[in-house]
Curated annotation (Swiss-Prot):
Listed GO biological process terms: translation
Tagged with keyword Ion transport: no
Family from the record: Belongs to the bacterial ribosomal protein bL35 family.
Disulfides per UniProt: none
Protein name per its UniProtKB record: Large ribosomal subunit protein bL35
Keywords: Ribonucleoprotein, Ribosomal protein
Gene3D superfamilies on file: 4.10.410.60
InterPro entries linked to this entry: Ribosomal_bL35 (IPR001706), Ribosomal_bL35-like (IPR021137), Ribosomal_bL35_CS (IPR018265), Ribosomal_bL35_sf (IPR037229)
Protein source organism: Dechloromonas aromatica (strain RCB)
Region entry Disordered, spans: 1-21
Any coiled-coil regions, as ranges: none
Bias-annotated ranges (Basic residues): 1-15
Keyword Chloroplast appears in the UniProt entry: no
Length: 65
């Protein structure tokens, strides 16, 4: 059976943490930032975890992670 391929878009967007949760970047931080407050932009700065209901589909996209 051939090797499974990792989705290139998923490997650029997600990473697996040591505890098994999946790390992702925050959305809404690329452009149109002038109308957003400093507080909103500060909260969007850090990474967050993928929701547990979406984690299975993300893991299927990255079989060797």
């Amino acid at each position: 059976m051939p090797k499974m391929k990792t989705k290139s878009s998923a490997k650029k967007r997600f990473s697996i943490r040591a505890g098994g949760s999946i790390k992702r970047g925050q959305a809404f931080k690329r452009h149109i930032l002038t109308k957003k407050t400093t507080k909103v932009k500060r909260h969007l700065r850090g990474a967050t975890a993928v929701h547990e209901r979406d984690a299975a589909s993300v893991r299927a996209m990255m079989p060797y992670a």
